[in-house]
Design a protein with these regions (language model features):
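N-terminal leader/targeting pre-sequences
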Residues: 1-162
Length: 162
């Protein structure tokens, strides 16, 4: 099965996102073992150009329509295709795992695109800030990864022995 995979490997952020076909879209499985404390905006971005400081070459949020920023998949209001809400590690386990379902796209649509962890909480487009309707006022880009093509058997971070 062909999928899309993005891997985060920095001192602050470690994790991976695996995208596989699912019904009329994709299933996006995210798994993180290291994140800074607090909630962080989590979005798929349009480009995959890592040149430049702080993931700045990755452009705006990925969207197959003409939508404004909104909540996570499954929200009742219109949203960018790449709006995934917030991620946060809670408790002593120090890991975050969540699955998302995105309609109308295939794993290959994400190849070469990026996924970003932002410094601050995403206001889901509901804040009164100038950038609430475009970025969710999520702040700086503190971690980014590019989706690559994978056709091999999954070797997920969760299943590896260290």
């Amino acid at each position: 099965m062909t999928s899309a995979v993005a891997v985060f490997k920095t001192d602050e952020i470690q994790g991976e996102v695996v995208v596989t076909p699912y019904k009329s879209g994709v299933k996006l499985n995210s798994y993180f073992t290291r994140l800074p404390p607090g909630k962080h905006g989590f979005h798929i971005h349009k480009a995959g150009d890592l040149r430049g400081e702080g993931c700045m070459g990755l452009c705006e949020h990925y969207d197959i329509g003409r939508n404004t920023h909104g909540g996570k998949p499954g929200s009742t209001r219109k949203r960018h295709t790449g709006d995934l809400g917030n991620i946060e590690i809670k408790g002593k386990r120090q890991e975050f795992q969540k699955s998302y379902f995105l309609k109308g796209i295939k794993p290959k649509d994400l190849w070469g695109r990026s996924i970003i962890v932002h410094k601050d909480e995403d206001d889901l487009g509901k804040g009164g800030f100038e950038d609430s309707k475009t970025t969710g006022h999520s702040g700086a880009r503190i971690g980014c990864a590019i989706f690559g093509r994978s056709t091999c058997a999954p070797k997920t971070l969760k299943n590896r022995r260290h």
